[in-house]
Amino acid sequence: MALAVRVVYCGAUGYKSKYLQLKKKLEDEFPGRLDICGEGTPQATGFFEVMVAGKLIHSKKKGDGYVDTESKFLKLVAAIKAALAQG
């Protein structure tokens, strides 16, 4: 069964490309193992929130910024690997 990864991003801010970039990178890292969905907010929220199996792992609103560095990406990878290991 695929692991749920949900990204809520600011649609009004034009963050869809950042979401699609992250989605592709995660799909390349975990081919066929993730169910990734994104939701763009219609109003300007500044959101770029990433949840793995319902748990908030990355939050731009809480100061994490975008997933724009290798260390931020590896934090997501570690959370996904842990969730997959729990099955």
Curated annotation (Swiss-Prot):
Main location: cytoplasm
Cytoplasm keyword on record: yes
Places the protein is found: Cytoplasm
Annotated positions of the S-glutathionyl cysteine modification: C37
Gene Ontology biological process: erythrocyte differentiation; response to lipopolysaccharide; response to selenium ion; response to stress
Domain of life: Eukaryota
Molecular function terms from GO: antioxidant activity
Chain coiled-coil ranges: none
Tissue occurrence: Ubiquitously expressed with highest levels in skeletal muscle and heart, moderate levels in brain, spinal cord, thyroid, spleen, prostate, ovary, small intestine and colon, and lowest levels in liver and lymph node.
Pfam family, one: Rdx
Covalent cross-link (Cysteinyl-selenocysteine (Cys-Sec)), residues: C10-U13
Family matches, as SUPFAM superfamilies: Thioredoxin-like
Keyword Transferase: no
Swiss-Prot/TrEMBL keywords: Antioxidant, Cytoplasm, Glutathionylation, Redox-active center, Selenocysteine
Function as written in the Swiss-Prot or TrEMBL entry: Plays a role as a glutathione (GSH)-dependent antioxidant. May be involved in a redox-related process. May play a role in the myopathies of selenium deficiency.
Subunit structure, as described in the record: Interacts with DPYSL2, PRDX1, YWHAB, YWHAG, HSP70 and HSP90.
Protein name per its UniProtKB record: Selenoprotein W
